[in-house]
């Protein structure tokens, strides 16, 4: 205060020296005494006191200062403010008085006045940091009071002013953040926090503050990032752990919601929820796996692939299940993406995607099938075939793979047909049939190829199969016309070729079903049902096959009836009257044969007068053309009658063939003989209506084979029909119809033994018989001779014509039976019937009765014999 007083004195001395005193009239001496008299009261006034110059203002300031200090010490804040204000009024440049008055205002909680005084003091002395610090402190107190009074905007202004005065202090910015949060100005607060983190990155609290703000703003991925940063700075931060647990719980809830929405089919909403879960907890790979699956189902393949690859990067060794699922889903994504490209026509891109999938998985058949489809569309048929084969190797019974392989083989077959490679085309169509045996068009295409390859039998068989599968197949009528001219669908289906085609088709279908095996409970039920149906069908066939079984059993019971000698037990069992009647019949037959021979000598060699049925002729042509060297022809009714008569005398001789010539086909002789033995003429068309089932045919075949083998062991020949029918003599000549392997005449002669001599007629029955090229026809009606009917009635050993026809009809399915036995021989329903001629005399009849050989007859004799029966 001394310096200030001296300054005040100097200020006072200046004007006293400069300003001149005014001139006044001096008062006369004794004037006051004259006025006041002798009173001493006013005498002092007149005394002139000495004037103190330069000490008036500083003394007052000093006085106010001392009094103000006393008031501060006495907590008399208002009086202190008064004295400091008077002092500042006397001297406004006194900085310390502003600071003292600010303290008094601060104690009075007048923060604004205090801040104003401090601001004045700081403005007068800017180099004094104490005033600035005191000012910011006052502002902080003021802002905090306002904040507590919920005056957030005023508090924000105060804190902002303090932060401007001291930007190095973060506490003022933190208070500003709090004010902004209270004011719900989140973007401004977020920007302020971001600026703060740019300046200071070591404060975990700031990260947590921003993480909470992000979580409030539903930005969990940013929240998790800041939370992760806070945990890196302070792993044991309690607030950070609490927030982390909260986010994990939110993520699990979002995952559950996404699963429910996905089950409901609301994939877009499920995707939103799983995104929220990933944002709350981006370190869980299962969330990315689920989202990748959603992307795949929504056909957002890029996002799906990215998520699955991220899962493979995130999983650890103890998460093998998630890794396998991610790999599986990645393969499915590649596959679905390839399918999408396939639908869009981008086949090459589909191949590339499937190559990626197959690089990691080689045991998935669907990948090979889809890549094969892409190759098929690109025209790379070889690659497509390789992929389909690989798929079938993994799953042989896959319906899709078999269907695609069939289509591929069909296309490859067409390509080979264009290049006129018909054999290769047939192979391709056969492969297609093997993979899809119930596709009718494959058989139709193969039939065309076989027709061009001159495989008529195979072509007809394929056409029959097409009729079985789909009679309304387009372009079938043309092949029907070429291969079965003049025949209807019913007639074709009644042929032996149709039976063979049906059998092969059933075998292929059953084989494919058995190879697949039952798949689960449904497959087992289907298999049981199929077995039950088979059992019912077999039982039904047994019921229908009673006549056939009865006939075959009787044949087995008397296998050597044609070869019975007069001294055998069976011959002795016959009545003596029957033997006498047989001798009389033999004599009559000899007389009739002599007459017939004379007539035949007068006539030239006969030509066929009646054409066989179309079905039999086609079948015989196809089967015989491949295994025999001669062609059969049809015979007239007269010729067949003559053959019947001759067959009765030579049926036993025909049974001397060896086992190598199995019973395969029927000759016209057996049919004629049976018709001759019946009580009345019956047509073969009626016999066709009594066609037996497959099981009956097989049973009859086996019985006939045993019968023929038994007779072949005997090596005996019967010379007459009467001899052949001694004992029980029923339909023994029927088995002769099975000589159908297109054997040459030399082979037949060899099997007959040394009793036959080679001749121009190629005798196969007896030396007196000459084979005729006659084609057996089922549709023609044969008329037996009166003599045959008479002989049949006389003997009384013959069955009814119905049983004979039933047994005869069963022999017509021999070629089909042979296919069942696996012999693989192409046989026809009826082989070439060997024409027979007899010029029987009394000596020849005696020789025949004693089983002796007889010389061969000439063509003239045969002609006479046939002429005789034609006249009858």
From Swiss-Prot:
PANTHER family found in the cross-reference section: TETRATRICOPEPTIDE REPEAT PROTEIN 16
Extent of the TPR repeats: 61-94, 96-128, 136-169, 251-284, 285-318, 331-364, 365-398, 406-439
Record field: compositional bias (Acidic residues): 577-590
Bias type Basic residues, positions: 762-783
Protein name stated in the entry: Tetratricopeptide repeat protein 16
Ranges of Basic and acidic residues composition bias in the record: 591-604
Keyword rRNA-binding: no
Ranges of compositional bias, category Polar residues: 610-640, 653-675, 689-709, 721-754, 799-827, 839-861
Alphabetic keyword roster: Repeat, TPR repeat
Residue ranges, annotated region (Disordered): 1-20, 557-640, 653-872
Pfam family, one: TPR_1
Signal peptide: none
SMART domains: TPR
PROSITE patterns: TPR, TPR_REGION
């Amino acid at each position: 205060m001394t310096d200030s007083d001296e300054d005040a004195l100097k200020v006072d001395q200046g004007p006293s020296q400069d300003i001149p005193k005014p001139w006044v009239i001096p008062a006369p001496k004794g004037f006051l005494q004259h006025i006041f008299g002798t009173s001493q009261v006013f005498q002092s006034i007149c005394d002139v006191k000495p004037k103190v110059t330069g000490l008036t203002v500083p003394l007052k300031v000093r006085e106010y200062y001392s009094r103000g200090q006393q008031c501060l010490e006495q907590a008399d804040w208002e009086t202190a403010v008064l004295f400091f204000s008077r002092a500042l009024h006397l001297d406004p440049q006194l900085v310390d008085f502003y600071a003292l008055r600010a303290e008094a205002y601060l104690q009075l909680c007048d923060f604004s006045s205090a801040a104003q005084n401090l601001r004045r003091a700081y403005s007068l002395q800017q180099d004094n940091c104490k005033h600035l610090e005191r000012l910011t402190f006052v502002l902080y107190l003021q802002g905090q009071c306002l904040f507590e009074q919920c005056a957030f905007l005023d508090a924000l202004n105060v804190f902002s002013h303090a932060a401007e005065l001291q930007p190095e202090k973060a506490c003022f910015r933190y208070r500003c953040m709090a004010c902004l949060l209270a004011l719900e100005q989140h973007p401004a607060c977020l920007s302020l926090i971001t600026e703060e983190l740019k300046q200071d990155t070591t404060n975990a609290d700031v990260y947590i503050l921003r993480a909470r703000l992000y979580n409030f703003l539903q930005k969990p991925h940013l929240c998790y990032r800041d939370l992760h940063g806070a945990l890196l700075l302070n792993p044991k931060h309690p607030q950070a752990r609490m927030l982390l647990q909260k986010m994990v719980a939110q993520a699990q809830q979002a995952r559950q919601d996404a699963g429910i929405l996905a089950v409901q089919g609301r994939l877009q909403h499920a995707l939103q929820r799983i995104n929220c879960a990933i944002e709350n907890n981006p370190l869980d790979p299962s969330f990315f796996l689920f989202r990748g699956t959603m992307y795949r189902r929504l056909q957002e393949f890029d996002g799906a692939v990215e998520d699955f690859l991220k899962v493979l990067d995130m999983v650890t060794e103890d998460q093998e299940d998630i890794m396998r699922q991610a790999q599986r889903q990645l393969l499915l994504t590649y596959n679905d993406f390839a399918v999408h490209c396939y639908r869009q026509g981008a086949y090459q891109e589909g191949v590339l995607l499937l190559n990626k999938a197959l690089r990691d998985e080689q045991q998935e058949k669907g990948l090979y099938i889809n890549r094969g489809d892409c190759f098929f569309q690109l025209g790379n048929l070889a690659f497509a075939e390789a992929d389909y084969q690989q798929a079938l190797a993994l799953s042989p019974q896959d319906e899709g793979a078999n269907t695609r392989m069939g289509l591929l083989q069909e296309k490859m077959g067409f390509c080979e047909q264009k290049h006129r490679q018909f054999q290769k085309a047939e192979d391709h169509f056969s492969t297609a049939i093997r993979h899809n045996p119930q596709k009718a068009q494959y058989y139709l295409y193969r039939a065309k190829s076989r027709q061009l390859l001159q495989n008529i039998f195979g072509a007809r068989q394929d056409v029959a199969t097409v009729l079985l599968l789909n009679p309304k197949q387009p372009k079938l009528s043309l092949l029907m016309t070429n291969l079965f001219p003049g025949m209807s669908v019913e007639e074709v289906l009644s042929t032996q070729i149709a039976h063979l085609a049906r059998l092969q088709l059933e075998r292929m279908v059953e084989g494919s079903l058995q190879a697949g095996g039952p798949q689960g409970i449904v497959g087992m039920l289907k298999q049981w049902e199929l077995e039950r149906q088979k059992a019912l069908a077999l039982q039904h066939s047994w019921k229908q096959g009673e006549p056939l079984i009865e006939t075959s059993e009787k044949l087995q019971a008397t296998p050597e009836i044609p070869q019975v000698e007069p001294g055998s037990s069976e011959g002795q069992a016959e009545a003596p009257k029957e033997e006498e009647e047989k001798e009389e019949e033999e004599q009559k037959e000899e007389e009739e044969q002599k007459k017939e021979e004379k007539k035949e000598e007068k006539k030239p060699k006969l030509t066929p007068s009646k054409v066989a049925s179309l079905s039999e002729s086609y079948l015989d042509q196809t089967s015989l053309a491949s295994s025999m060297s001669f062609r059969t022809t049809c015979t007239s009714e007269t010729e067949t009658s003559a053959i019947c008569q001759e067959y009765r005398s030579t049926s036993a001789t025909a049974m001397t063939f060896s086992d190598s010539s199995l019973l395969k086909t029927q000759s016209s002789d057996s049919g004629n003989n049976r018709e001759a033995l019946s009580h009345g003429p019956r047509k073969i068309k009626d016999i066709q209506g009594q066609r037996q089932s497959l099981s009956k045919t097989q049973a009859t075949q086996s019985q006939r084979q045993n019968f023929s083998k038994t007779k072949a062991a005997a090596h005996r020949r019967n010379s007459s029909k009467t001899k052949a029918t001694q004992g029980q003599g029923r339909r023994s000549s029927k088995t002769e119809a099975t000589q159908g392997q297109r054997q040459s005449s030399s082979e037949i002669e060899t099997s007959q033994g040394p009793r036959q001599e080679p001749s121009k007629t190629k005798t196969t029955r007896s030396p007196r018989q000459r084979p005729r090229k006659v084609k057996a026809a089922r549709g023609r009606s044969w008329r037996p001779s009166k003599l045959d009917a008479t002989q049949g009635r006389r003997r009384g050993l013959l069955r009814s014509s119905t049983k004979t026809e039933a047994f005869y009809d069963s022999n017509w399915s021999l070629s089909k039976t042979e296919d069942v036995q696996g012999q693989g021989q192409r046989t026809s329903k009826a082989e070439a019937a060997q024409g027979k001629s007899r010029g029987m005399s009394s000596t020849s009849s005696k020789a025949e009765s004693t089983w002796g050989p007889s010389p061969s007859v000439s063509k003239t004799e045969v002609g006479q014999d046939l002429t005789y029966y034609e006249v009858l």
